[in-house]
Amino acid sequence: ITTCWSDWSRSVEDAFDALSQHMDAVFVGGLSAGAVLSLRHAQRYPGRARGLALYSTTLRYDGWTIPKLSFLLPLILKTPYFGKRYRFEEAFPYGIMDDKLRGRILAQMQSGDAAAAGFTATPGASLKQLWGLVAAVKRDLPSIKTPTLIVHAGNDDIASARSNALYVRDHIGGPTELLLLDRSYHMVTIDQERNVVGDATARFAWNLLSDAERERLAAVAREPVPAAPETSAQTPDAAAPSPASSVAEGMEKAAEGAGR
């Protein structure tokens, strides 16, 4: 591994700065270690993010698929031999409860298509960097005042809700919303309740916008985009909604549903 956790954190900062140049409100969120990086950004830059969305926050690997002796791993990785050679291999069900989806994702992972599905194994050096990030975040978790959405599977196979989601809820300094899922494992953003996760995220973000921002977002949802140029393979009949329009419309509908 050629990067450390401060490099990971810096990449979040760079992406945030780039978005901030074009957006009125920026939310920061991530899955697993990405959730921990989101917390770190909120620590370093208080008040910049409008809200945090934490999916399957992983402060500790203690789900039901993790070996009971895994607490010895930090000591093992300090040895020169294992420190360079150890790789954490994911086990069935690979964070996914949906059988069909799991089969497709696993095939991509095993084919080496990391861009599409990630890896089946994590190098020990990466784990050591993650633990350093977690330690930094936990030391100053109460300093975070940013409104936070916490989404976690109640039966997470990788990181238990008790040691992770509930820990964040009980120690963070700002207001929180907690969503525990019944039909998902660790990969909550793609598993069986992904639509529930999407609706909760849209509703959370909508509630943190000002009236003026909501009006602008609703206006975007009503704006069509020009149809794509005609090709031999496709002849559009009418303008299609842009991705931004679809997101805006989804947020508006989610908020309306919450108000009923």
Name what the model sees in each region.
Residues I1-F27:
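Catalytic nucleophile-loop/oxyanion-hole region of alpha/beta-hydrolase
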Residues G30-S32, A153:
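Conserved alpha/beta-hydrolase "nucleophile elbow" surrounding the catalytic nucleophile
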Residues A33, L37, R44-P123:
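Alpha/beta-hydrolase-fold enzymes
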Residues P123-D140:
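Active-site nucleophile elbow and catalytic-triad environment of alpha/beta-hydrolase enzymes
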Residues I144, I150-H152, D156:
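Short beta-strand/loop motif that positions the catalytic acidic residue
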Residues D157-N164:
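Conserved alpha/beta-hydrolase "acid-adjacent" motif
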Residues R169-M187:
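Catalytic histidine neighborhood in serine/cysteine hydrolases
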Residues D182-D237, P241-R260:
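Catalytic active-site module of serine/aspartate enzymes centered on a nucleophile-bearing elbow/loop
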